Design a protein with these regions (language model features):
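Rossmann-fold NAD(P) dinucleotide-binding segment
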Residues: 211-224, 234-251
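Adenosine-phosphate binding glycine-rich loop
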Residues: 124-125, 243-356
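Flexible, glycine/charged-enriched surface loops at secondary-structure junctions
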Residues: 23, 60-69, 92-94, 129-137, ...
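Glycine-rich phosphate/diphosphate-binding loop of Rossmann-like nucleotide-binding domains
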Residues: 105-223
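N-terminal ligand-binding/catalytic initiation module
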Residues: 1-107, 346-354
Length: 356
């Protein structure tokens, strides 16, 4: 409900450079609505999606603009939007990504952003610190698609994830977040409060938003090796950054778009904490969207292993591109500057070659 034109323009600008870092032939745009799905029935959400597409369809196309899901928009909503698009245009093409697999979606699209975040983190830690995620304690914020799949992949790599959060509060589970419980609370449109986790899992602690540390977020006030902000913009403050540093955190890897406040980034970098901006580390989602577009265009279906392999390779390439650019411009290990310079150069060079 807080979406406005200013936010969308800013995110569209960022999307251009995120897409640029992938090296894939995609531009960048953003769209959205201030419709709040909380408390709405499936039928009400479907009605809205259909009405939205009736206004949107003339501005999008497989070779024009291909919208994808984001906050509040998952496979269900994409399905409603795509169904209305087909009814209006009678076209079956790759005009939306993140579609259900049954009619044109790609395997791994729901997992792509979260998995990509972890693949980027693993590559960065391996190259910069000769470390792995196995056996490491990690903090994650959020309980949406990106956060849940970030937690899932971290656990698959042997990490112990001890936090997750929603708009009402944060769960800390020292034995490791039980994804089955979180999905029971948040899955299939349930969207129940994470407070229910504490009643189901003995030993876990729930902190309501009203009880958060002054100027901070409870998810970042526990000891961890790496932190993964995966919820929303400006969720990790300077206060949080100071606490992470105090607790021995060595890396912060953004899963959400711009979740870390600028003064927090400055502090983390000054203290030697590896920091990856979202335009680099969360590019996995848009990458697999492009994979989906490629499959739609060629009328193919890739198997899971192929998509996963290509995603891992692409995230490693993004890390390498960002890291080498940072070194080239005298700002080694500054992945913010490295990402911005690498992305801007590719866009600028393309514009010059096209005579823009």
């Amino acid at each position: 409900p807080s979406v406005d034109t200013g936010i969308l323009k800013f995110l569209a600008f960022e999307q251009i450079f995120k897409n640029s870092l992938t090296g894939l032939p995609i531009g960048g745009a953003k769209g959205g609505s201030d419709f709040d799905p909380k408390g709405k029935s499936d039928f009400e959400i479907m009605k809205f999606c259909r009405a939205f597409m009736r206004e949107l369809y003339q501005y999008i196309g497989a070779r024009v603009d291909v919208p994808a899901g984001d906050i509040g928009v998952g496979a269900r909503e994409i399905g409603y939007l795509y169904g209305e698009y087909k009814r209006i245009t009678r076209n079956y093409d790759g005009v939306l990504s993140g579609k259900p697999y049954e009619f044109g979606g790609s395997l791994m699209r729901p997992q792509a952003t979260g998995y990509g975040v972890v693949y980027f983190a693993a590559e960065m830690l391996s190259q910069e610190l000769q470390e792995t995620l196995e056996g490491k304690t990690c903090c994650v914020s959020g309980a949406g698609n990106v956060a849940l799949h970030t937690i899932e992949k971290l656990q698959q790599m042997g990490a112990l994830v001890v936090t997750c959060s929603d708009s009402e509060g944060t769960i800390y589970d020292p034995r490791g977040i039980d994804l089955c419980v979180v999905r029971e609370l948040k899955g299939n449109g349930a969207r129940a409060s994470l407070e229910g986790y504490a009643t189901r899992v003995p030993g876990s602690v729930y902190t309501a938003k009203a009880d958060y540390p002054a100027g901070g977020h409870a998810a970042w006030h526990y000891p961890c090796f790496a932190a993964f902000p995966c919820a929303t913009q400006n969720e990790l403050s300077r206060t949080d950054a100071a606490k992470l540093i105090e607790n021995g955190c060595v890396a912060v890897v953004e899963g959400a778009n711009m979740p870390t406040e600028p003064d927090a980034i400055e502090l983390l970098q000054r203290e030697g904490v590896l920091f990856s901006p979202g335009k680099a580390s969360n590019a996995g989602g848009v990458a697999v969207s492009e994979f989906e577009m490629s499959q739609n265009a060629s009328m193919e279906k890739w198997d899971y292993d192929k998509v996963d392999r290509k995603l891992q390779e692409l995230m490693a390439q993004i890390y390498k591109r960002v890291s080498l650019t940072a070194k080239e411009y005298g700002c080694e290990r500054n992945f913010v500057d490295g990402a911005n310079i690498a992305a801007f150069k590719r866009v600028a060079e393309a514009m010059i070659l096209e005579g823009v």
